Amino acid sequence: MFKLVLSDPSIFKTSFDAISSIVDEVQIEVDSDGLRLNAIDRSHITYVHLELKESLFDIYECDKPIKLNLDTEELMKVLKRSKNDDVMELTVDVGNLILTFEGAVKKTFKVKLIDLEYDTPSQPDIPYDIKIPIPVSILKEAIQDIEIVSDRVSFEVDEDKLTLEAVGDFADAKIEYLHGEKINEKARAVYAISNIKEMLKAEKFSDNTYLSIGTDMPLTLYLELLNEEGLLSFLLAPRLEEED
């Protein structure tokens, strides 16, 4: 028996809005504890992890582990047809994931499961010394400010602030955020703005957002649901200063 019911489909929609812009195909693993996926883009630049606990769902029935191989673009087309006040139900039949959205009207879609030889990438274990809480709205606006002058951005952290900075051909930009954390060391790295914008498509997943960074190390963005019922995280490889 497989049946998942969620009264807030926006959690799925915002997750896969970001995920579908990063990877073409995913394998969603579901068992009695919850739903999870781990994926990396073809260029091995961005890694994504999604985990939704069993307790998040209104109804959660999964009597044996199941793997759902899906085309993310096709899944996102369907999720876009949901409304925030719909109730979403996930079931399966032979070769299909069935999504039902019920509100003022009832909509049912079947998304074909695909054949996928998939080696689930293991989640990188990076020993960060710096983890900074930052409202995702502030991060998004900072990136919008920076991208008018450059296609890459440097993140720099010291004991007082997080600084986002870019130097362009015709203009420069610097955004400073007082993080209020106890930071004992400095860190700096450069990242592609286009990749950060893909990650920030998930901004509505949660307001509980953190950044981890190290010098010339990947940037990790964490979005956590309340009560630890869900986590969406992205790990972005840095750009080297000498890269064109």
Curated annotation (Swiss-Prot):
<dbReference type="InterPro" id="IPR022659">
    <property type="entry name" value="Pr_cel_nuc_antig_CS"/>
</dbReference>
<dbReference type="GO" id="GO:0006272">
    <property type="term" value="P:leading strand elongation"/>
</dbReference>
<comment type="function">
    <text>Sliding clamp subunit that acts as a moving platform for DNA processing. Responsible for tethering the catalytic subunit of DNA polymerase and other proteins to DNA during high-speed replication.</text>
</comment>
<dbReference type="InterPro" id="IPR000730">
    <property type="entry name" value="Pr_cel_nuc_antig"/>
</dbReference>
<dbReference type="GO" id="GO:0006275">
    <property type="term" value="P:regulation of DNA replication"/>
</dbReference>
<keyword id="KW-0235">DNA replication</keyword>
<dbReference type="InterPro" id="IPR046938">
    <property type="entry name" value="DNA_clamp_sf"/>
</dbReference>
<dbReference type="GO" id="GO:0003677">
    <property type="term" value="F:DNA binding"/>
</dbReference>
<comment type="similarity">
    <text>Belongs to the PCNA family.</text>
</comment>
<dbReference type="InterPro" id="IPR022648">
    <property type="entry name" value="Pr_cel_nuc_antig_N"/>
</dbReference>
<dbReference type="Pfam" id="PF00705">
    <property type="entry name" value="PCNA_N"/>
</dbReference>
<protein>
    <recommendedName>
        <fullName>DNA polymerase sliding clamp</fullName>
    </recommendedName>
</protein>
<keyword id="KW-0238">DNA-binding</keyword>
<dbReference type="GO" id="GO:0030337">
    <property type="term" value="F:DNA polymerase processivity factor activity"/>
</dbReference>
<comment type="subunit">
    <text>Homotrimer. The subunits circularize to form a toroid; DNA passes through its center. Replication factor C (RFC) is required to load the toroid on the DNA.</text>
</comment>
